[in-house]
Amino acid sequence: MEQGPQDGEPIEIKIIKEAYKKAFVFVNKGLNTDELGQKEEAKNYYKQGIGHLLRGISISSTDPEYTGPEWESARQMQQKMKETLQNVRTRLEILEKGLATSLRNDLQEVPKLYPEFPPKDMSEKSPEPQSLSSLPQHSEVNGSTSTASAESSSTPTTLSLPCQSHPSEAPPAYTPQAAEGHYTVSYGTESGEFSSVGENFYRNHSQPPPLETLGLDADELILIPNGVQIFFVNPAGEVSAPSYPGYLRIVRFLDNSLDTFLNRPPGFLQVCDWLYPLVPDRSPVLKCTVGAYMFPDTMLQASGCFVGVVLSSELPEDDRELFEDLLRQMSDLRLQTNWDRAEGENEFQIPGISGSASDQLKEASGTDVRQLDPSSKDVRQKGKRGKKTKGTSSEEVNLSHIVPCEPVSEEKAKELPEWSEKVAHNILSGASWVSWGLVKGAEFTGKAIQKGASKLRERIQPEEKPVEVSPAVTKGLYMAKQATGGAAKVSQFLVDGVCTVANCVGKELAPHVKKHGSKLVPESLKKDRNGKSTLDGAMVVAASSVQGFSTVWQGLECAAKCIVNNVSAETVQTVRYKYGHTAGEATHNAVDSAINVGVTAYNIDNIGIKAMVKKTAKQTGHTLLEDYKIIDNSKGENPGGGASANLKGEKDEQKEGPEKNGAKKKDK
């Protein structure tokens, strides 16, 4: 294995690093030219990148003597180069066959105003329009229609009259039957408007472009193939009709180092032909109370334009939750505070024109958001802006109902059975009584120990000459006390760390356990005959049992500490009285060392894997029962000042107990 002349780095690692660097330079150049539509130049860059990738992969790095962090990094580079080589070869094969186009060409390809259909037979041709005099009137109507479909632009487009030498390019006349060269797309009836072309016609125009066209590092986080509509709001408050249901997807770029170089955001949201860049904590998104998501329209240069995204009520709940979770992670998602619908309002009012929603979004849209591409701002398929009709199909998605966003502060009151509340209050009250009794019993026990020790000292005759303890023994006991005290602190620190990790893991697991666990419970256990939740009642009793056990456990802990402190203090004082001050100090160090050893042993027992699993499971259960805790407001019944179901309050009460006991000792 050859070594580098300067820094001692193996020459093989240098070759791998150089090939890695040059390969990705050419691959990135190929991606840029590929996105710009320069296919031939992109293929040349891809081929050069493949050459460097093959060179870097050809170096052997699996020999046993190739060990260390440098070789591990080199192997990771080679693994990444292998994955990139496979993707580049796939893309190059697509380019050479001419089977794919770039994302920009897909989005800039504006469909024709009218769909193309095979010509009819001569026998079925509809009659010619009555006269060309109707064309100016019809063009004026179509002109206003096209202007309404592009309401976000500041300058309305005018529809010029077609040349009479090309009658097939003329817009259809409003005749009872379709004019020559045109086809009836939909027709109205008494029960509504029906489509005459079927669902497949619309679905073929709403398929997402291939993911390969976005680059080698594009990762599709979510794809909703159908059931998503968008509408547009211009600065004047005019709202377009919702588009025909289409697809939605969120794409993230894995290689963040290329974002600045390629002038692209970390990810983007795509709904049919509309794109929105997603930058964490910078891209404003407003979720309205009616369930629609409002975005600033960054594809237009005009300010004050917004886009609303509406999800179908028939979409799976998992897709809806995943979409909102991704928006929280990749944008600045905010919830609308309040929006009241007018009384007697039957039609769905787009929240983009309401004062509160519009103001909130305008305020948030002041953030500078990077665009996907400067030249793609005006790219839009105008044909999808208007609402298209659809036929009665078995796969039809119902978009008439929108899932509203319920306020977070309003919680549904649980209807609990009476027996559950009674049992829960009895458990809490009994636990408080037991805890109070333990603490009081420990206090009386401490007083009895002090009284007995004082009587014992009255009967003991002190030694005339104090017992001399060897300095080596005294120093050894003192060092043992210091060592065991340090071990106790370290073990306690480790236990606290384990508890912290277990608490975090338990809190993260609790929502998933609660969500999937409820599916396993039979419906017969969820509701009783009176419509009250039997399961919630059982959960309330379980939560109260956990709270009661915690209360009793804290009382036991407080009582044990009180008794141990009293026994230790009286033992040291008795030895000091009998054998002198030196022997008393040695006894004090020995007793403290014994206590520290016991505490350390207890802490070590709570650090193992089993203890970690137990604490995680226990914290998961506590978090699950958090919503079912109750508060016992009967202050007169509890001798300790009220049985509170809040564990934090009980901890504070138990902490105050030892402080009061300590104050009594000092007074004595």
Swiss-Prot record:
Residues 128-162 have a biased composition (Low complexity). The modification Phosphoserine is found at S126, S470. Interacts with ITCH and WWP1. Interacts (via MIT domain) with IST1; leading to the recruitment of SPART to midbodies. Interacts with MAP1LC3A and MAP1LC3C. The lineage of its organism: Eukaryota, Metazoa, Chordata, Craniata, Vertebrata. There is a cross-link at K362 (Glycyl lysine isopeptide (Lys-Gly) (interchain with G-Cter in ubiquitin)). It holds the Pfam family Senescence. This is Spartin. It is found in: Cytoplasm; Midbody; Lipid droplet. A motif (LC3-interacting region (LIR)) lies at residues 193-200. Residues 110-176, 348-396, 631-668 are annotated as: Disordered. Its main location: cytoplasm. Residues 190-380 are annotated as: Ubiquitin-binding region (UBR) domain. The senescence domain is required and sufficient for lipid transfer. Residues 16-94 form the MIT domain. Lipophagy receptor that plays an important role in lipid droplet (LD) turnover in motor neurons. Localizes to LDs and interacts with components of the autophagy machinery, such as MAP1LC3A/C proteins to deliver LDs to autophagosomes for degradation via lipophagy. Lipid transfer protein required for lipid droplet degradation, including by lipophagy. Can bind and transfer all lipid species found in lipid droplets, from phospholipids to triglycerides and sterol esters but the direction of lipid transfer by spartin and its cargos are unknown. Residues 431-503 are annotated as: Required for localization to lipid droplets. It comes from the Eukaryota. GO terms for cellular component: cytoplasm; lipid droplet; midbody; plasma membrane.
